[in-house]
């Protein structure tokens, strides 16, 4: 994690509204990092408002009462939020839907799950929601499709992975940030889920 700690990292609600963040902890094996906002002096009013709502900024995002206690189930519907490709297409948050297609990750990794929700480069670290608005996982770095294609002779389609909420919580707890489980139980529309995601997801930029 020392390499990440030497990089400048900023967060915000888009590429033009960024504030500096300190990298407190990293977990390379799970593609997780814990950030702390270091200054909001130059932030826009919208960014300050978003940071105020979050209270705690974690990359991937997790905070008090957001993570679901039960791990995802096979066939469960999910919604993924993030800022794929940064600001190349637009500065706005993007959401995609899908379902849990396997309850294990690459190489039978029990700490991850597979989903068919569309995930593009730059989506890593984005929250994955269940139908009630609870976070059930965090998008892990995208599958190296070229490498897989060379191994099996074809490009994998709709194969993406998430880190289970239980692993995210374990990382936060070991970093000295205990969290409470989320208990949302009312099913929401995708529009409602997107609204929640917009208020809980930030763009993270690592500057070389």
Language-model region placement:
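Catalytic-histidine neighborhood of serine endopeptidases
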Residues: 1-40
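Terminal peptide-recognition signature
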Residues: 21, 35, 75, 80, ...
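C-terminal cap/linker of serine protease catalytic domains
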Residues: 6-8, 20-21, 39-47, 53-55, ...
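Flexible glycine-/small-residue-rich
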Residues: 13, 25, 36-39, 82, ...
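Flexible, glycine-rich surface segments
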Residues: 119, 125-129, 152, 156-159
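Flexible, gly/ser-rich surface segments that form the specificity/activation loops bordering the active-site cleft
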Residues: 25, 45-46, 57-111, 120-123, ...
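Short, solvent-exposed secondary-structure boundary/capping segments
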Residues: 30-37, 108-116
């Amino acid at each position: 994690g020392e390499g990440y700690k030497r990089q400048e990292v900023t967060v915000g609600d888009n590429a033009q509204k960024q504030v500096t963040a300190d990298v407190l902890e990293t977990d390379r094996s799970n593609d997780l990092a814990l950030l702390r906002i270091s200054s909001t002096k130059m932030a826009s009013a919208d960014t300050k408002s978003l940071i105020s709502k979050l209270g705690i900024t974690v990359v991937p995002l997790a905070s008090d009462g957001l993570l679901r206690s039960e791990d995802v189930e096979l066939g469960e519907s999910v919604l993924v939020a993030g800022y794929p490709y940064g600001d190349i297409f637009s500065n706005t948050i993007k959401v995609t839907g899908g379902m849990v297609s396997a309850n294990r990750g690459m190489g039978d990794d029990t700490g991850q799950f597979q989903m068919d929700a569309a995930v593009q480069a730059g989506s890593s670290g984005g929250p994955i929601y269940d139908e009630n608005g609870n976070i059930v996982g965090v998008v892990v770095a995208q599958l190296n499709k070229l490498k897989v294609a060379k191994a099996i002779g074809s490009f994998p389609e709709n194969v993406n992975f998430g880190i289970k909420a239980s692993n995210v919580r374990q990382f936060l707890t070991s970093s000295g940030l205990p969290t409470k489980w989320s208990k949302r139980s009312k099913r929401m529309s995708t529009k409602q889920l997107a609204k929640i995601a917009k208020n809980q997801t930030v763009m993270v930029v690592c500057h070389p």
